[in-house]
């Protein structure tokens, strides 16, 4: 996947598959979110080696990791999706994450990244994409609504960061209109009996 656009402040911005050399830039964006936001509900920062392993694991499991880079190759944003839950019944559902470097927010990179991930999930034949968002993150909620996501649940006080409880909003986007055929129902029932 390679998609290019131009931005006056950053020059040409390319959306492409991440490579190991992008790991330091991804780690920097991740760590900024750990330190300064509730976009990530982790307290521990990571290094480039951790992110390189993460990229490799996502790829090994068949999931994309995308980056938006400027003309110098600096990582401006990244995104991925992976399993929503690790049970067979959820195999058609994925959960995504998108993070944009602080000085690059408001340039449309989050929208481009999320749209590219939605496209990739459709190509993979996924059925639903889930977003798990801090319920006070109104810009992220608005972006997801603009791309067709709908609110599907709220878990109050599900997380804790910066000395306060955080509410978790789930949003979902149905990626296709497939129904359920009788053979699938019978096969699932047969597996459940064994």
Regions found by a protein language model. Name each.
Residues 80-83, 130-133, 145, 150-167, ...:
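Conserved catalytic-core motifs of GNAT/GCN5-like acyltransferases
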Residues 14-26:
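A short beta-loop-alpha structural element at the N-terminal edge
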Residues 105, 131-141:
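Conserved beta-strand-loop-alpha-helix junction that forms the acyl-donor binding cleft
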Residues 27-55:
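Conserved GNAT-fold acetyl-CoA-binding loop/helix
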Residues 44-103, 114-115, 174-175:
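Acetyl-CoA-dependent GNAT
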Residues 92, 157-194:
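C-terminal "cap" of GNAT-fold acetyltransferases
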Residues 121-133:
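Conserved GNAT acetyl-CoA-binding A-motif
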Residues 106-119, 142-146:
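Conserved acetyl-CoA-binding loop-helix of GNAT-fold acetyltransferases
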């Amino acid at each position: 996947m390679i998609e290019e656009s131009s931005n006056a402040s950053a020059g040409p911005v390319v959306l492409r598959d991440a490579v190991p050399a992008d790991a330091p830039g991804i780690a920097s964006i991740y760590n900024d979110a750990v330190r300064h936001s509730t976009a990530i509900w982790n307290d521990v920062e990571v290094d480039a080696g951790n992110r390189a392993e993460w990229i490799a694991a996502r790829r090994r499991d068949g999931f994309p990791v995308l980056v938006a880079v400027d003309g110098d190759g600096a990582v401006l944003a990244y995104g991925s999706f992976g399993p929503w839950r690790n049970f067979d019944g959820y195999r058609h559902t994925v959960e995504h994450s998108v993070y944009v470097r602080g000085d690059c927010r408001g340039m449309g990179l989050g929208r481009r990244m999320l749209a590219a991930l939605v496209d990739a999930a459709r190509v993979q034949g996924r059925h639903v994409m889930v977003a798990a968002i801090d319920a006070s993150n109104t810009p992220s909620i608005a972006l997801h609504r603009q791309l067709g996501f709908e609110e599907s649940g709220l878990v109050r006080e599900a997380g804790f960061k910066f000395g306060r409880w955080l509410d978790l909003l789930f949003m979902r986007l149905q990626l296709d209109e497939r129904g359920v055929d009788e053979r699938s129902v019978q096969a699932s029932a047969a597996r459940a009996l064994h």
